[in-house]
């Protein structure tokens, strides 16, 4: 995993450095409401500024149609927020590869920054179009990828352009690959993996890969009901994937054969409807009422999961235990987050997506060893899939 070239030690003075960042941040009324991803790119940006580079930042934001400018997807607020964070002027180009971008880049002095407009305003970005790659490459003398969140996409700005310029990894991307790669290649044991979320179908590859790597796998979230079905339990009106029951059973068997502990809920919080004001009850996992749905793990399960987490020396968590967005069903996710935070002996790695939202919600982010910035990218790396954005830097 260590064989990607990083920007550290590279002479960037006076060079136009084209940097793919992940500024896909939430914006409301023209203001960035969560700047986590912008902050995550600061070490690379500040390193380049200090080294005297002419820094050209490019990113996507949201899912525009790809037919040109759309006000709600402009990166202008992200550029403004970056300027506030580094306390320096940041130029903004009203296009990506057009006249304004070229003019703003030409006007840069060493150590100055321009942010280009949303890459995905041009549909050629997602198609990794050769012509578009060439146009991007003309804007820089070297290329840096620091957008781990999109490293699993073979787009023009993540893969195509890297073939046309001297290409390096930024500090964020290199750190992600090193941490997640190290976790898989040589984890301190016991290695405990906690997997939640609603669908087994989304996590099959990850669970399969972790059965080969982990000592204990903890299952929560909506997908636990497909596993409970595989064990022969009735799950009422809970979310279930009938087509995946057999596959879930195979994974339970594989774990058993490998001597991997696979923990499933022994009790669940059930509700009569999917709503904050639902009538709720706690019942054992083998006696769920036929007219109710499971929306969280129960207290007995919380205690068992917390005990297993406490034993880990490497703890990886991806996916909530229940519908933590609703107060009535947040307790299981909160209990797991607290258990992970409380394990001071372990390397604790939060694998992107909803788990990050959860540790932020419960104000526990600072207690974790490492929080991944990539949801899909972290999962694909854990699954053992090559990431186009990383492969392009080898």
Where would I find each of the regions flagged by the language model?
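Active-site loop-to-helix "anion-binding N-cap" substructures in soluble metabolic enzymes
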Residues: 1-394
């Amino acid at each position: 995993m260590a064989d990607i070239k990083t920007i550290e030690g590279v002479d960037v003075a006076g060079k136009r450095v084209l940097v793919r960042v992940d500024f896909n941040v939430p914006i409301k009324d023209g203001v960035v409401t969560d700047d986590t991803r912008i902050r995550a790119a600061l070490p690379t940006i500040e390193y380049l500024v200090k080294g005297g580079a002419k820094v050209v930042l490019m990113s996507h934001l949201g899912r525009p149609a790809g037919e040109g400018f759309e006000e709600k997807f402009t990166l202008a607020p992200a550029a403004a927020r970056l300027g506030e964070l580094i306390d320096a002027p940041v130029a903004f180009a009203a296009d990506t590869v057009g006249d304004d971008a070229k003019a703003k880049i030409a006007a840069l002095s060493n150590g100055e920054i321009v942010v280009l407009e949303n890459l995905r305003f041009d549909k050629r970005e997602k198609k990794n179009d050769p012509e578009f790659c060439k146009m991007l490459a003309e804007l820089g003398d070297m290329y840096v990828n620091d957008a781990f969140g999109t490293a699993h996409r073979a787009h023009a700005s993540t893969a195509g352009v890297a073939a046309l310029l001297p290409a390096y990894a930024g500090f964020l991307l290199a750190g992600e690959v090193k941490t997640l790669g190290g976790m898989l290649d040589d984890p301190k044991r016991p290695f405990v993996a906690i997997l939640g979320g609603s669908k087994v179908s989304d996590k099959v590859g990850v669970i399969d890969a972790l059965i080969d790597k982990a000592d204990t796998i903890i299952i929560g979230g909506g997908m636990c009901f497909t596993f409970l079905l595989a064990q022969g339990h009735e799950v009422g009106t809970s979310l279930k994937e009938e087509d995946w029951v057999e596959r879930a059973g195979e994974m339970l068997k594989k774990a058993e054969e490998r001597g991997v502990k696979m923990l499933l809920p022994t009790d669940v919080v059930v509700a009569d409807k999917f709503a904050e004001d639902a009538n709720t009850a706690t019942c054992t996992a083998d006696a769920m009422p036929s007219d109710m749905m499971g929306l969280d793990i129960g207290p007995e399960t919380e205690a068992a999961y917390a005990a297993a987490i406490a034993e880990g020396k490497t703890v990886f968590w991806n996916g909530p235990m229940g519908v933590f967005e609703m107060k009535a069903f947040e307790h299981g996710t909160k209990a797991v987050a607290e258990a992970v935070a409380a394990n001071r002996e372990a390397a604790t790695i939060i694998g992107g997506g909803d788990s990050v939202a959860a540790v932020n919600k419960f104000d526990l982010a600072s207690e974790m060893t490492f929080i991944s910035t990539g949801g899909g990218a972290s999962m694909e790396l854990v699954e053992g899939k090559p990431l186009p954005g990383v492969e392009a830097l080898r």
